[in-house]
Amino acid sequence: MSSPQLVAVLERAQSLGHIGPGEIDSYVKHAIAHLSAADPTHGASWCDLGSGGGLPGLIVAVERPDLMLTLLDRSSTRVEFLEQAVRQLDVVDNVEVVEGDATALAHNNLYRGAFDGVFCRSFGSPSATAECAIGFLGGTGCLVVSEPPEVSPQRWPLKSLQALGFAGAEIVDGPPRFAKLAVATPPGLDVPRTWKQIIKKPLF
């Protein structure tokens, strides 16, 4: 059951266009399923990549106050909303909101390899998501990505993932469905590339 404060925050996100149309409760249930698929250890540090309207980050913050969360988004408008939402939900002690380009922040010493896990709901293509996320993950970290309902064996090609530093992709069947990508080896120092390079020449 969603709290009135959380519903109000997500309704505002919806009115601002930060999340799509539909029932708020369905977004909350999806975020809780995302958290369940990730199964973070107590006190772990996680990043919500491209947090947008706070899905799943804000729900995770409410459900798991033991976690240290960083909500990352490049839009100043969305970041302003997230900062207000964090105060409204009284989760300021365990949530940091960061504005910036993921491809740049992943090379910042404050964030590179700093997280036990990365949540991602709708950041970009699988290739762009994997390339950006691995820069934020520590040596035993894990990326947990929301997946479309239809199965696509080519969505996460093993050789391409291994070249980045992931062990592969484990699919958590739902509904909803998620992909879990565990780090096997540290990424190269040039990973991730710039957005221009990522878009022009995707890795897969």
For each feature predicted by the language model, list its residue ranges:
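Class I SAM-dependent transferase core
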Residues: 1-47, 77, 84-90
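Conserved SAM-binding motif I beta-strand of class I
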Residues: 68-73
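SAM/dcSAM-binding transferase cores
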Residues: 155-204
